[in-house]
Regions:
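Multi-pass alpha-helical membrane architecture of UbiA-family
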Residues: 1-174
Length: 174
């Protein structure tokens, strides 16, 4: 239990805050919650768990290079996988398969880019990615952007993130 809280506590707290903000925004606008908002909330939690799990997988790969055997399968991986699966199913029901796949690839790619370049950025990875992906989901759900534009949107954000990561990496090394 302590291991689960240590690894997932802060990211899940960030996701909870994001969901509460969404809830209060809906209440301020005097709008009722519908299935779309619930799907978005599940997506926020599942993407947070995906980010944390990818982070652990990268840690595991680095441990292999250092000849250390510290990787352990524990309850948080099983729980993370189940919640991720639920998030994917919910996303498919509310959005489309294409945007769901883009969403998953994007989260995994951004996580890798952040983690490999700077420890400073790693601290901010969870809230940044939750906000970015939440925004992307809102755009797609509201029909404000179509799939070709969403691909451009993801590409621009990825390039910007990589650029910031590289700059921080150079500053840190310098």
């Amino acid at each position: 239990m302590k291991l689960f809280l240590k690894k997932y506590g802060i990211p899940l707290l960030g996701a909870t805050i994001m969901c509460l903000l969404l809830f209060f925004l809906r209440k301020i606008q005097n709008l009722d919650f519908n299935t779309k908002e619930i799907f978005i909330m599940v997506s926020i939690f599942s993407s947070t768990l995906l980010i944390r799990t990818v982070d652990d997988i990268i840690d595991y790969k680095e441990d292999i290079r250092n000849n250390k055997k510290t990787f352990k399968i524990h309850l948080s991986y099983i729980l993370g996988s189940l919640l991720l699966l639920i998030g994917i199913i919910m996303n498919i029901l509310s959005v489309q398969v294409i945007s769901t796949l883009l969403f998953i690839i994007y989260v995994a790619y951004m996580t890798f880019a952040f983690y490999k370049k700077s420890r400073i950025l790693k601290i901010f990875i969870y809230p940044i990615l939750i906000v970015v992906n939440f925004t992307q989901l809102m755009f797609i759900n509201n029909g404000l952007i179509n799939y070709p534009i969403s691909i451009v949107y993801i590409s621009i954000l990825t390039i910007l993130t990589l650029s910031i990561s590289i700059i921080f990496g150079i500053v840190k090394k310098g």
